[in-house]
Regions:
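Bacterial Sec-dependent N-terminal signal peptides
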Residues: 1-23
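Acidic/polar surface patches and capping/hinge elements
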Residues: 23-527
Length: 527
């Protein structure tokens, strides 16, 4: 996992050097933005789109590498994962710019036209690709692969079609719309509109959610309201640079960077379930931070955020995070490295900051899924007028197209390998969402005091002011006292308290724990 993080850090570190050069929008940037816009209109599939971002970035890199004596293509001319990309040579002009831009455009056009053929926006995706080609002055009917005469279009078509063929056998099951081939959930779905979680057979395993209406991350209303596990078999997809020493197999599952099993619950053993209850209990606790009117202000400037040091080992987890107040032991940074001056404080309501974080990683600027968020960030930085494009901040200025292509290659590889590793682990360990665990434990009761009502070893830990029992005089007791003795939590109150999404925030208050929701729309599968 450290190597994956290194790829991300490296791909971003080559960016953050300030200068005064003007930035041009390259053909690579144009096509990447076209891809991001198509992702925003597609089904919300982070795994699929990390792969799209990687394959398109690698194709652009390979074509650029052919123009440089010091560079080598990754796919073209090589056999990758048992798939051959035959190539010998190409006749470049003295200035290869025109041919290269043409080759990039045709390769991108072929790949995107194929990958978004079944997009939920129908023909609008293809219209977008056609329009981009037209704006660049290229003929979309040119499908020749005869690049022997130095045709950039033919070279792009050739590589684009090879990338399509490679993708049809890389383990993603693209030909069957990325459907799962062997995974099945052991639990019946949780119907979110109902209280509790009465049909959870195994409280350590993943559970589908049944929604009244399912609208995915990109705003598409899906014609079924109980979505499957997204990509639990993704560990079987060809990756870029994950060491084989990190590979694990068990039955049909392949996964990498094995972190070991998550915290589990034994419904009959409190002692062995401590970490399970603490982990999901912290989710409930931090959910109480989602009220912008609670008066809690925090500094979100670099003076207070970041510089947290080494991540904790498992046994140090609960000392690393602040269970009650939120946050980690970030020391912040004393000085701005550019100005040499301390950072100005940026005081904001904690409830605004926490909600923005949740909404960004769920929806991002325009719902291009988390892998796409990183490309949105990199495009913003790459286009900034103060960015001076030097490798690690030193040496000569790097050409805009070379800079974009190398940035995309590094970031695309990092996103794809991260997806292969992360979703492979998710699928293998098959762990449940917080909402499944919290509602399950709430329905069981509490595990704090066997002399008090609603005691059960599988129940929640009682915490004064945060997790308590409903008393007869409690507003949550119900008209007939039907909720007396149940568990209540002080938490975000949920979507029932949102009438106008533009203005309402629901706020934080006491709710029945069996009706707990994460901070999310009721039409979207929760984190």
């Amino acid at each position: 996992m450290r190597q994956l993080i290194t790829y991300i850090i490296f791909s971003l570190s080559i960016l953050f050097t300030v200068g005064v050069s003007a930035q041009n929008v390259t053909v690579a940037h144009e096509w990447n933005e076209t891809l991001l816009q198509s992702i925003r209109k597609d089904f919300a599939r982070p795994t699929v789109h990390s792969r799209n971002l990687w394959h398109t970035s690698a194709a652009m890199y390979d074509l650029w590498a052919l123009t440089e004596d010091s560079a080598s293509p990754y796919f073209l001319g090589n056999t990758v994962d048992g798939f051959s990309f035959p190539f010998k040579s190409f006749s470049w002009d003295e200035d290869p710019t025109v041919q290269l831009e043409e080759a990039i455009s045709y390769a991108m056009y072929r790949i995107l036209s194929h990958r978004f053929f079944n997009s939920p926006e129908g023909g609008f995706a293809q219209n977008r690709f056609d329009a981009k080609m037209s704006s660049l002055g290229y003929d979309i009917t040119n499908n020749s692969e005869a690049f022997g005469n130095g045709s950039g279009a033919a070279l792009g078509n050739y590589l684009g079609n090879l990338m399509i063929a490679y993708g049809l056998q890389d383990g993603a099951n693209e030909a069957q719309q990325y459907q799962n081939t062997f995974y099945n959930s052991v639990n019946d779905p949780l119907v979110m509109a109902f209280s509790g979680n009465p049909d959870l057979q195994d409280p350590n395993r993943w559970q589908q959610l049944t929604l009244d209406v399912f609208i995915d991350q990109s705003g598409n209303e899906i014609p079924f309201n109980t979505p499957d596990f997204l990509s639990p078999e993704w560990g079987n997809v060809n990756h870029f640079a994950i060491p084989e020493s990190e590979k694990q197999t068990d039955g049909n599952f392949t996964f990498f960077h094995d972190p070991g099993p998550p915290s589990l619950i034994d419904p009959n053993n409190i002692e062995s379930s401590v970490d399970y209850k603490k982990g999901f209990g912290m989710v409930v606790q931090w959910s109480s931070h989602l009220d912008p009117t609670d008066g809690v202000m925090i500094d979100i400037s670099p003076a207070s955020l970041g510089n947290a040091g080494e991540l904790p080992d498992e046994e140090q987890f609960y000392d690393y995070y602040n269970f009650f107040e939120g946050g980690d032991p970030s020391l912040g940074h004393e000085l701005n490295p550019v100005t040499g001056q301390p950072y100005e404080p940026q005081m904001v309501p904690r409830g605004d900051y926490t909600r923005v974080l949740a909404e960004f990683w769920a929806d991002g600027p325009d719902s291009e899924t988390p892998p796409g968020h990183w490309f949105t960030l990199i495009n913003y930085v790459n286009s900034h007028p103060m960015l001076e494009k030097r490798y690690e901040g030193v040496g000569p200025i790097i050409d805009d197209l070379e800079w974009d292509i190398k940035s995309y290659f590094l970031l695309g590889a990092a996103m794809h390998d991260s997806a292969v590793s992360t979703w492979g682990i998710k699928g293998y360990y098959d762990y449940l969402r917080p909402v499944s665990a919290i509602r399950y434990m709430a329905e069981k009761g509490h595990c704090t005091d066997s002399t008090r009502p609603h005691y059960d070893p599988a129940g929640m830990d009682l915490i004064d002011g945060q997790v308590e029992l409903v008393e007869a005089s409690d507003p949550l007791a119900g008209n007939q006292g039907q909720h007396v003795g149940k568990i209540k939590v002080k938490s975000w109150r949920g979507p029932d308290y949102i009438n106008n999404p533009d203005n309402d925030v629901a706020g934080v208050g006491w709710i029945l724990a069996e009706e707990w929701w994460p901070y999310q729309r009721p039409s979207f599968v929760t984190p």
